[in-house]
């Protein structure tokens, strides 16, 4: 009996080891990482800390490469060029950061004196609200660099962001509705939030969507595919979240202060303030996102139960 038990135990561990190796082989080849299968293989509680780090790293790299090679050739070229430019700018910033900061301060002071600057900023912020445009965070931080934490800066951001979002949503809800549906299908996170919006499309839920870590312009277009979301609720949801724009103004003002001061301690304080602000914003956004995912899972489970109940067979039925 002991021999049989040991044989069964050995066979059990061999099977587990084989399944574990097979999973990582599939992981390397990109198999088994679809939206429906991704969460089925996260039982990594029995892995060591080092194995978990390696697992998460390999998973992240694989997902990035899968998404990258799924793009059109011209999109991959643009992404590579953009990544190269960001790397060059980061290197230049590291080497010539003092000169660059002083130049930014001079330019911001000049732009602040021009009457046309608010109009230009509102226009640019308005247009980056349309997918696939990018640059909302950059323009918002630039506004903070020019006007600091001020009512004028907040009004510029609020007008551009709210009007741009509403117009983008209206366009994709009506004329470009098919394109909006494709935007939702591009990301399962969008699909999850779309399911929640179909259950509850109040402006509070839409405000929560704006606080989650989703691309700004893509969110405006994707929500247009959700049935039942009104322009009124979408507008109110965006207005509610306009205080969030003060964060961009704060970051811009700290960057400007770093260029104006000569004190190393003051620069370090400003840099730490920026990092802590970004970290707090990121943590808040991800907490909200994971709570949203939990609610989405509850809706999925409830839908499964309802479907199962609908398919119950009458035991008295005879053929």
UniProtKB/Swiss-Prot annotation:
InterPro entries: Golgi_membrane_TVP38/TMEM64 (IPR051076), VTT_dom (IPR032816)
Source domain of life: Eukaryota
Membrane topology, as annotated: Multi-pass membrane protein
Example of a GO biological process term: vesicle-mediated transport
Positions in the Cytoplasmic compartment: 98-118, 165-232, 289-319
Entry-linked Pfam families: VTT_dom (PF09335)
Subcellular location: Golgi apparatus membrane
Lumenal compartment segments: 1-76, 140-143, 254-267
Gene Ontology CC terms: Golgi membrane
Sequence intervals crossing the membrane: 77-97, 119-139, 144-164, 233-253, 268-288
Cell inner membrane keyword on record: no
Key words, A-Z: Glycoprotein, Golgi apparatus, Membrane, Transmembrane, Transmembrane helix
VTT domain: annotated span: 144-255
Glycosylation sites: 16
Annotated domain remarks: The VTT domain was previously called the SNARE-assoc domain. As there is no evidence that this domain associates with SNARE proteins, it was renamed as VMP1, TMEM41, and TVP38 (VTT) domain.
Functional summary from the UniProt entry: Golgi membrane protein involved in vesicular trafficking and spindle migration.
Family: Belongs to the TVP38/TMEM64 family.
Protein name per the record: Golgi apparatus membrane protein TVP38
């Amino acid at each position: 009996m002991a021999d049989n038990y040991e044989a069964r135990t050995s066979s059990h561990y061999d099977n587990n080891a084989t399944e574990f190796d097979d999973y990582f082989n599939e992981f390397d080849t990109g198999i088994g990482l679809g939206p429906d299968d991704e969460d089925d293989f996260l039982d990594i509680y029995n892995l060591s800390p080092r194995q978990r780090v390696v697992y998460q790293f390999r998973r992240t790299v694989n997902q990035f490469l899968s998404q990258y090679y799924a793009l059109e050739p011209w999109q991959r070229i643009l992404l590579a060029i953009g990544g190269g430019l960001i790397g060059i700018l980061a290197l230049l910033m590291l080497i010539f950061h003092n000169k660059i900061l002083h130049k930014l301060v001079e330019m911001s002071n000049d732009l602040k004196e021009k009457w046309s600057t608010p109009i230009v900023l509102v226009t640019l912020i308005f247009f980056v609200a349309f997918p696939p445009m990018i640059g909302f965070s950059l323009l918002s931080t630039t506004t903070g660099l020019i006007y600091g934490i001020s009512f004028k800066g907040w009004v510029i951001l609020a007008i551009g962001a709210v009007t741009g979002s509403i117009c983008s949503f209206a366009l994709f809800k009506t004329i470009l509705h098919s394109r909006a549906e494709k935007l939702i299908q591009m990301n399962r996170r969008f699909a999850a939030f779309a399911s929640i919006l179909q259950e509850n499309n109040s402006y509070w839920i839409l405000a929560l969507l704006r606080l989650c870590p989703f691309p700004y312009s893509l969110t405006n277009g994707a929500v247009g595919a959700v049935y039942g979301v009104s322009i009124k609720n979408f507008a109110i949801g965006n207005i509610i979240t306009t205080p969030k724009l003060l964060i961009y103004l704060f970051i811009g003002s700290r960057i400007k202060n770093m260029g104006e001061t000569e004190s190393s301690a003051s620069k370090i304080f400003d840099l730490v303030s920026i990092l802590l602000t970004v970290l707090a914003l990121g943590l808040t956004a991800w907490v909200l996102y994971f709570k949203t995912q939990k609610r989405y899972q509850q809706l999925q489970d409830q839908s499964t139960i309802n479907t199962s109940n609908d398919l119950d067979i009458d035991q008295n039925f005879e053929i």
